[in-house]
Amino acid sequence: MKMADAKQKRNEQLKRWIGSETDLEPPLLKKKKTKVKFDDGAVFLAACSSGDTEEVLRMLDRGADINYANVDGLTALHQACIDDNVDMVTFLVEHGACINQPDNEGWIPLHAAASCGYLDIAEYLISQGASVGVVNSEGETPLDIAEEEAMEELLQNEINRQGVDIEAARKEEERIMLRDARQWLNSGQINDVRHTKSGGTALHVAAAKGYAEVLKLLIQAGYDVNIKDYDGWTPLHAAAHWGKEEACRILVEHLCDMDVVNKVGQTAFDVADEDILGYLEELQKKQNLLLSEKKDVKKSPLIETTTTGDNNQSVKPLKSKETLLLEPEKTAPRIETLEPEKVDEEEGEGKKDESSCSSEEEEEEDSESENEADKTKSSVPSSVSNSTPTTAPSSITVTSPTTPSNQVTTPTSPTKKVSTPAGKLSPKEEDRKDESPASWRLGLRKTGSYGALAEISTTKEAQKEKDTAGVMRSASSPRLSSSLDNKDKEKEKEKTRLAYVAPTIPRRHVSTSDIDEKENRDSAASLVRSGSYTRRRWEEDLKNSDGTASTNRTSSYQRSTSHTLALGRTSSSRDLPAKSSSASSLEPNNSKAWQPSSYYQSYSIHRSGSFGRRHEDPLSSTSSSTTTTTTTSSVTSPTGHRSLLSRYWAEESAEKEKEKEKESATVIPTINTAGTTTTTSTTGTVLGSDGRERRRSYLTPVRDEESESQRKARSRQARQSRRSTQGVTLTDLQEAEKTIGRSRPTRPREDEKEEKEKQDKEKQEEKKETETKEDDYRSRYRSFEEKYRTSLASSTTASSTIPSSSSSSSSSLYSTSSLNRPNSLTGLTSTYSRSTRDTDRESDRKEKDEDRDGDDKSQPRSIRDRRRPREKRRSTGVSFWTQDSDENEPDHPSDSEGSTKGEPQSDRLSSNDPLSTSTSSTDRYESLSSRGIGESRRPYSRFEKDDSTDYKKLYEQILAENEKLKAQLRDTELELSDLKLQLEKATQRQERFADRSQLEMEKRERRALERKISEMEEELKMLPDLKADNQRLKDENGALIRVISKLSK
């Protein structure tokens, strides 16, 4: 039964098979042998690459080309150099391979060897005559692309040995093209050969590489500006693709079709570099305007006949053949003239652009043709310098003389021979033609170069003479405006022309001779442009100039292109020692008085540039005329004048001290040590530590709290109305402590509180005036005082001499609450004066000393009496310091006691830092110890009848307390260093933890990647199995087909 079913199914299959596609196929498959035929050159390259020299020899015998290049232009020698196959390189060179064969990018085999760093191959190639000065398409020599030092050294030595000029090598192609273009122009016939692969012409190459001069000559020789290569690219496509703005401009000027498409439908805009797209759109607008205006004008297809010889003629680049024929003769003298210029330009600009030379030559030739036209005119002097400018500062008004009608220049067509050959030119004309480019090129340089202003000064007289004969066109005005902007034709009727400034003018050198022209031309408007580099020289000229030069210089309104310099501004007061207008008039070197024409400059002199603004801003905003005048004179006055001036200020401020306390402080400038920077005490900017130290040392505090001299006078008045033994009550002391405690946060109101406090004390003291004290207590008090003085006499003499001498010789102006003076200077009295909390007790103590000195005439005067009051001190040439400066510097409070000691500035500066120096530390302990002394003195100052006070013991206690405090300080310093160490360890630990976490993250990522790799490896292992399964299925399928075909038979 099963067999029957199987047969039935099989029969059904066979029925379906009949007539199927497989059944219609022949039973025997036609087996065609597939043959791949390679090009002989490709086989040759493969044989060379495999190193099979025998096969290479056989192929060479059969006629294979040893210099065959693949699609990239690589030859077998290139490939052998890349593969580092020295044997094959030697073999190929010996059998005649071209050693300097370039590939599509211009690389020769030496480029390849230098790039890969194969020193032995490079040495061999050089020994066989490989050129070290060959440049590739990007202008790079083998030295430029060498990376290893040994290779660079080898190539550099070879360059030096052969004397190769690299710059000349870079411009070799342009020079050859220029020579050929001139030859074609002279012969009137173009012998150009298209590139075998791309179909590119000389015009394509010149446009792509930006050879502007070659481009012009080729167009004049009769090249079609819309010529296409094999891909349909025009020269405009090439120039736009490689971003050559100058080439684009020249092609557009000559009315090339900007909408031509290549074989893939792209216009020049589609293939253009994105940086040049905007410029191309602008050129298209100009071309459309030009075409619309020239529709009805009948013109020659190549050279337009100009009706005027004006130097602003409409189409300048279209030169006559006569001018171009003369260029070979002019080349030699021009090159000689340009040699120093090239050196300067290389210094200023570094590596120049390839096309900079050609753009300079283009400027040259234009100027030549213009100057020729000018010299053939009647000598009508230009009235430019006398004309009144009415235009905006950006435009320059130029009036040009009219050319007589009988002197119209009509250039010949380029296809004809020139009627006047170069040899027949008169020597006078040759001289003139050589003169004009040299003088033009003399000024052709960037304004920012270092030597620009020197050039201006040397050529200024020559330029003035030239301006009377004719006006040269500015190098900075773009060519496009002169040829495409035909609105100029209307302006030519009025004999004026405004220079159009294009947004981007590439590779143009701004001529400094034009700056001279503008300076002479616009002397009425007095417009001078200067670069940021040349400003310093101008300032030196201003400084050293005589009266006449300074007058001329000042009447001109200076205009600068630098960011930091503005109209009539000085760059920075550091760089310009005395450049203000009033400064020049006050200098002793300047013999002539300043002219009235300097008004605008002196008006704007206080407006500094961005760098000098900090010091000069307060001056410009000063309301007081006296302050401004003093500022200007203090900037420039010499040292003697400065000391005299500061003395005057010291006397004046002493007289007006009381008025200044009530009024808001006027800004009084202080003279800096250099004498160049004018700073005010209210300047908000934070100076450095040196500046702060300098300023503090020169400022005299007018009145912060009550001055020492005023306090002395007040205490004398109080002593006249009461006895010296009269005490101060406990309530007085408590009130004084409260007042001083409150005065800490409220420093500006401390003066008023102290005055009230003193008045209250005087009233109380007058009430107690009637009270009598026992005479025996007074005598006892004096005896104790004398005992104390004798016990401390030895220590006092040693320590008091130095401070007293230093106090008379130095005048430090800031006083701090902790002064570095010994305890025994004036006994315990000076200890009291160190603490501002004990000011009342200190004044009381001084009064008692005064009475005691009055009774005992034999006692020497105390150091306090030897000090001069502030008003009687002699001025040291420093101006007084106002109250505002103390408010601006709350870090350094000036206490009531003036600093009479010769304390160094560093000590004063560091007095706020308890750990800075040991002297400041001891000052802190002495000020702290004064509290303990105050507490121990309080019962005695209330005149209780306690005669058991032992001053020596007190002194020893104070010393012991000081030692304890010093020990505590050492302990705290040690603790601080320990804490710092712990902090550093903690930070290092944190960093380590961070590093660890980072490492863990990396490890995790690595594990994940490794897992992925292992999974992929597993899949790769499965791949052969899958392939085997696939093959098996294919085989089974083939077997089934064969079985079916057999069964069908």
Curated annotation (Swiss-Prot):
Q: For bias kind Basic and acidic residues, which ranges apply?
A: 319-341, 426-436, 485-497, 649-664, 702-711, 747-789, 835-863, 890-906, 934-947
Biological process, per Gene Ontology: actin filament bundle assembly; actin filament bundle distribution; axonogenesis; convergent extension involved in axis elongation; exocrine pancreas development; liver development; midbrain-hindbrain boundary morphogenesis; motor neuron axon guidance
Gene Ontology cellular-component annotations = A band; cytoplasm; PTW/PP1 phosphatase complex; Z disc
Q: Give me the stretches of Polar residues compositional bias.
A: 303-315, 545-564, 593-607, 820-829
Region Disordered, as annotated, extends over 302-947
Q: Can you provide one Gene Ontology molecular function annotated for this UniProt record?
A: 14-3-3 protein binding
Which superkingdom, per the lineage? Eukaryota
Q: What does this protein do?
A: Regulates myosin phosphatase activity.
Identify the stretches annotated as ANK repeats: 39-68, 72-101, 105-134, 138-164, 198-227, 231-260
Kindly list the cysteine pairs connected by disulfide bridges.
none
Kindly state which keywords UniProt assigns to this record, in alphabetical order.
Answer: ANK repeat, Cytoplasm, Repeat
- Acidic residues biased stretches: 359-371
Q: Pfam families under this entry?
A: Ank_2, PRKG1_interact
What name does the UniProt record give this protein? Protein phosphatase 1 regulatory subunit 12A
Q: Organism, per UniProt?
A: Danio rerio (Zebrafish)
Biased composition of type Basic residues is found at 712-722, 864-875
